[in-house]
A protein has these predicted regions:
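Beta-stranded membrane pore/translocator domains
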Residues: 1-211
């Protein structure tokens, strides 16, 4: 099991690294399990030192975190983090929703402290090509993130709580002041480029595919 991903920059920018270090991880699978168990920290440090020399890591001032899980099915998880920013782009396709079921969002965030982010967002509803923009703030506390977003031009406020149950599972609760609506969702990450979210939006349940 091998995974290299980031929640700080779009994963598509790391494709070259992902394929390169897949080869490095294949070399580890050829080692005896007992050896990997004894030297796990040294092997993690070796991978970290190699990653720190990569242009993508240096140019974007990224911070890799590596976890090796010894065993017959050896696992290598590489998270590429940043202390400075969070940038992501997502597309949404909603199955079982009557309107606004195709959309996309861009998020550009700047970390102003280890636990605090200010950001701007741009969202487009593809059904009627309607643009929405917002500025906001997030406070990160443990596995949770508390966000406030002021959306324009509609002028309403969003309040959002997200909680990571595990690297793959996430809960979301969101309140939209404009129509006084609450939204509850459970999200599962299938792989780096695809997630699925089951959403209850106040009057309807629907499945959201996120790419």
């Amino acid at each position: 099991r091998y995974e290299l991903r980031s929640e700080a920059i779009p994963n598509v920018l790391l494709m070259k690294l992902k394929y390169k270090y897949a080869g490095e991880c294949d070399k580890l699978r050829g080692l005896p399990v007992a050896y990997v168990q004894r030297h796990r920290q040294e092997l993690e440090q070796q991978l970290l030192e190699k990653l720190m020399t990569e242009p993508e890591v240096k140019n974007y001032q990224l911070r890799p975190e590596i976890k090796i899980t010894p065993g017959a099915d050896l696992g290598v998880n590489i998270m590429i983090e940043s202390d400075d920013y969070k940038i992501w782009f997502e597309g949404y396709g909603d199955i079982g929703r009557d309107k606004e079921n195709l959309s996309g969002k861009a998020h550009l965030g700047k970390m102003i402290s280890p636990h605090d982010e200010i950001f701007g967002e741009a969202e487009v509803i593809l059904n009627n090509v309607q643009w929405r923009f917002g500025t906001g703030y997030t406070h990160y506390w443990g596995k949770s993130g508390w966000s406030y977003v002021r959306r324009i031009p509609i002028g309403d406020n969003n309040y959002r709580l997200e909680y990571s149950l595990s690297p793959k599972w996430r809960l979301r609760v969101e309140h939209f002041s404009g129509d006084n609506r609450n939204e509850f969702a459970v999200r599962y990450r299938i792989h780096e480029f695809l997630s699925a979210e089951y959403v209850y939006g106040g009057k309807e349940f629907y499945l959201r595919l996120i790419g």
